[in-house]
């Protein structure tokens, strides 16, 4: 899925990714494995619960903990935890994936990489359920058991029967593993939210631990309920298949079949399956939480490297290169932190190069921040145009904000994309620490699609399934280039229906070129098909876009823009007293112009019909949903950044060159009327 990157660039990206994240990943995996014996001990204690003989209960539990078979299964569980941790590393994302329609959500779930993720987790869930069943002992330990009523099968010899209790355990573990994988992508659990307040790793883990255990127990309860319903209707299929394949009998004299109501009302079985699910989810969530804590910990990027060989990791070069997304997020987070709390590092930003006397550090940092903010402005303008005209944003071409060039841009001049793409499928496009990604040629667009059929492409092109901007297009509005998921012929037809002035107007007569009769007939048929399908409730149920999801998708990567705002505004405010060379004053008009233009775009955006003016109340949950309110945090950060600059410089800003509209808006900030 990753775009083709040259070998040296990919190698440098992998090197910096390993230097920054390598030890964090190893530490999170080690702690996940070290915490596994504690979880296993709790599981053994509760699996042998005996309230009437507490001393005997505890002594037997701890004696079993040191037995050879428990140690063996503990090693096997450690391998499972390592595999789960590797998948956490491979599938993380710093930009959440927000499908804007139900069909896009289905496409996200059935993507080949997601299917592989689900299959592996189902297998690992079955392995953990097998280990839990054996550790529990009793009637759940083995899949094959001797038949008690051997004579009933017509032979006095000993017969082997299928232990349906053990099969129930294995299938429940597989379903729990698959459900974990499904919710992992549906709830954006692969999204890495960066903490607003920096805390010690132990404090963050301790704060999440109680919520983690509670969430695991409740989720296991619901999964057991769902599995019982599923086993009641379909349980006979795996039971008959395994018994036939292994030539096993089904002894109904020992216990009732579990695919009946009376068989499923076995409270002991339900309790142990629920406990197994809670154990599985707790250990997997612990590894997931530890990876999130370690990966989002702040990292210090030096502004000026002490040695020449360390220049690849200095902050200006990281920001202006094309690093992996998480490295760029960590760099912007570091910019936000030191701009507030480190005067010595701020002095390095304001310093001049020797020899030459050029402000390379400030130029590189401010240029990247302004490029990010200009990119957000253009994105909001495109969204407003699409919403105002009921049209469609051109998703086929990435938005390239205008680059800021200056004479000082010689040191850190590297080709790059100034705006990170916002994928619609989970952002798996990152440099892997372990292996290269399995790529599929179908997913090339920034918004991506898991479908390759031309028929589905044309169908999706009619309803614009995966595009998060705009709404279904009216017949009179055909604009802004080809739709998503269109074939080459469709693109040519769209280009023909959108003639540019240079091609549609002749140089002599300035007359419009009329479309052919065949093309008009095709267009009419397409509109008739579109109107026919739009009246079908089931089709519109899958193709209609959710307004809230479309709005969230616009601000899905707003976290790095928030850090760019805060870092840039704090540096500008600090320059009033700390900038001895006046390097900030040369770019202050451009900074104010960018911030005020962005403020105007944000104000217009929040006046749109579907844009709520108040953030929704988000209840405390293990799964982070802060990305749903990023637009409100971005609006507050933008206004705070402008006020931070105006309160620091005061009336001195009246001497800054700006347009009349910006001067008026700046005066409102100076008078605290915004």
From Swiss-Prot:
Bias (Polar residues) ranges: 407-421
Keywords assigned by UniProt, alphabetized: Membrane, mRNA transport, Nuclear pore complex, Nucleus, Phosphoprotein, Protein transport, Translocation, Transmembrane, Transmembrane helix, Transport
PTM sites of type Phosphothreonine: 414, 440, 449
Name of this protein: Nucleoporin NDC1
Phosphoserine PTM positions: 406, 439, 445, 471, 474
InterPro entries to which the protein is assigned, alphabetical: Nucleoporin_prot_Ndc1/Nup
Residue ranges that the UniProt entry lists as topological domain Cytoplasmic: 1-24, 90-114, 187-225, 294-674
């Amino acid at each position: 899925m990753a775009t083709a990157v040259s070998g040296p660039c990919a190698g440098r990206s992998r090197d910096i990714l390993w230097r920054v994240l390598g030890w964090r990943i190893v530490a999170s995996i080690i702690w996940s494995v070290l915490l596994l014996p504690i979880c296993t001990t709790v599981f053994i204690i509760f699996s042998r619960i005996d309230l009437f003989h507490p001393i005997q209960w505890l002594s037997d539990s701890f004696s079993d903990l040191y037995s050879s078979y428990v140690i063996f299964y503990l090693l096997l569980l450690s391998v499972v935890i390592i595999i789960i941790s590797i998948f956490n590393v491979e599938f993380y994302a710093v930009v959440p994936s927000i499908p804007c329609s139900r069909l896009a959500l289905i496409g996200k779930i059935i993507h080949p990489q997601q299917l592989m993720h689900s299959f592996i987790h189902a297998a690992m869930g079955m392995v953990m359920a097998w280990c839990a069943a054996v550790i529990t002992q009793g009637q759940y330990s083995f899949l094959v058991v001797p038949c008690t009523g051997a004579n009933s099968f017509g032979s006095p010899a000993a017969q082997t029967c299928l232990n349906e209790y053990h099969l129930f355990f294995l299938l429940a573990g597989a379903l729990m593993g698959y459900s974990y994988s499904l919710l992992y992508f549906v709830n954006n659990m692969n999204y890495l939210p960066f903490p607003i307040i920096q805390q010690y790793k132990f404090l963050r883990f301790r704060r999440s631990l109680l919520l983690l255990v509670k969430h695991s127990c409740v989720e296991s309860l619901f999964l057991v309920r769902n599995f019982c319903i599923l086993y009641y209707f379909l349980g006979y299929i795996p039971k008959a298949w395994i018994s036939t394949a292994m030539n096993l009998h089904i002894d109904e004299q020992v216990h009732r079949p579990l695919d009946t109501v009376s068989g499923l009302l076995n409270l002991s079985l339900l309790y142990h399956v629920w406990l197994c699910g809670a154990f599985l989810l707790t250990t997997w969530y612990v590894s997931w939480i530890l990876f999130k804590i370690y990966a989002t910990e702040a990292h210090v990027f030096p502004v000026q490297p002490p040695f020449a060989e360390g220049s690849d990791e200095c902050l200006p070069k990281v920001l202006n290169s094309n690093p992996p997304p998480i490295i760029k997020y960590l760099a912007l987070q570091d910019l936000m932190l030191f701009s507030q709390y480190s005067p010595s590092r701020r002095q390095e930003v304001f310093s001049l190069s020797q020899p030459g006397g050029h402000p390379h550090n400030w130029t590189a940092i401010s240029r990247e921040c302004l490029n990010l903010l200009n990119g957000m402005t253009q994105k909001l303008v495109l969204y407003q145009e699409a919403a105002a005209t009921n049209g469609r944003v051109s998703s086929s071409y990435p938005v390239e904000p205008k680059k800021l060039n200056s004479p000082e841009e010689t040191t850190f001049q590297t080709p790059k994309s100034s705006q990170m793409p916002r994928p619609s499928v989970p952002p798996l496009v990152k440099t892997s620490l372990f292996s290269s990604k399995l790529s599929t040629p179908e997913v090339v667009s920034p918004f991506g699609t898991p479908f390759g059929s031309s028929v589905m492409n044309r169908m999706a092109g009619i309803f614009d399934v995966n595009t998060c901007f705009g709404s279904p297009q009216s017949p009179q509005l055909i604009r802004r280039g080809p739709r998503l998921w269109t074939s080459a012929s469709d693109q040519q037809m769209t280009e023909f229906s959108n003639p540019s002035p240079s091609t549609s107007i002749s140089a002599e007569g300035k007359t419009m070129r009329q479309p052919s009769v065949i093309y008009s007939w095709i267009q009419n048929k397409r509109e008739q098909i579109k109107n026919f399908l739009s009246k079908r409730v089931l089709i519109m149920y899958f193709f209609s876009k959710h307004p809230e999801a479309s709005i969230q998708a616009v601000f899905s990567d707003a976290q790095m823009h928030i850090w760019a705002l805060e870092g840039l505004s704090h540096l500008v405010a600090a320059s009033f007293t700390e900038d001895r060379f006046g390097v900030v004053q040369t770019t202050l008009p451009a900074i104010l112009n960018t911030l005020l233009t962005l403020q105007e775009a944000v104000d217009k955006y929040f006046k749109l019909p579907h844009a709520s003016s108040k953030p929704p109340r988000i209840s405390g949950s293990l799964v982070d949903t802060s990305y749903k309110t990023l637009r409100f945090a971005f609006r507050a950060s933008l206004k705070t950044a402008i006020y931070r600059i105006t309160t620091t410089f005061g009336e001195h800003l009246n001497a800054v060159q700006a347009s009349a509209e910006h001067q008026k808006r700046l005066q409102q900030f100076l008078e605290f009327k915004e």
